[in-house]
Amino acid sequence: MESLVLLLLFLLIMGGFMFFASRRQRRSMQATIDLYNSLQPGDRVNTTSGLQATIIVVGDDTVDLEIAPGVVTTWMKLAIRDRILPDDAYMDEHEAEPGDFVYCDELEESDGSS
């Protein structure tokens, strides 16, 4: 009798774990679907490969992304990871100047090692 109670308790715990895991997965999937359905020309996006671009044309399964002025490439919608929100425009306000970066050669010279 005691082993039956333990088995039922174990099954109940496993069932609860599976329920909450699938619920979280469904919520994540719905957020991704909502993102793909809301893409519009002019949106700034990140791709899964880390590229930042501007959407030019939205098709059924593809998007045309402008990755540099006048350079447009076609990508699958599935390659879009997320939309760049206006709050993410920190770098637009604080553009880097060429002297702001330290290059590897400068690091080696400052350490005294060559």
Swiss-Prot record:
One of its GO terms (cellular component) is plasma membrane. It is found in: Cell membrane. It is a single-pass membrane protein. GO terms for biological process: protein transport. It holds the Pfam family YajC. The chain crosses the membrane at residues 1-21. InterPro entries: Preprotein_translocase_YajC (IPR003849). Keywords: Cell membrane, Membrane, Protein transport, Translocation, Transmembrane, Transmembrane helix, Transport. The keyword Nucleus does not apply. NCBIfam families: yajC (TIGR00739). Belongs to the YajC family. The SecYEG-SecDF-YajC-YidC holo-translocon (HTL) protein secretase/insertase is a supercomplex required for protein secretion, insertion of proteins into membranes, and assembly of membrane protein complexes. While the SecYEG complex is essential for assembly of a number of proteins and complexes, the SecDF-YajC-YidC subcomplex facilitates these functions. Part of the SecDF-YidC-YajC translocase complex. The SecDF-YidC-YajC translocase forms a supercomplex with SecYEG, called the holo-translocon (HTL). PANTHER family: SEC TRANSLOCON ACCESSORY COMPLEX SUBUNIT YAJC. This is Sec translocon accessory complex subunit YajC.
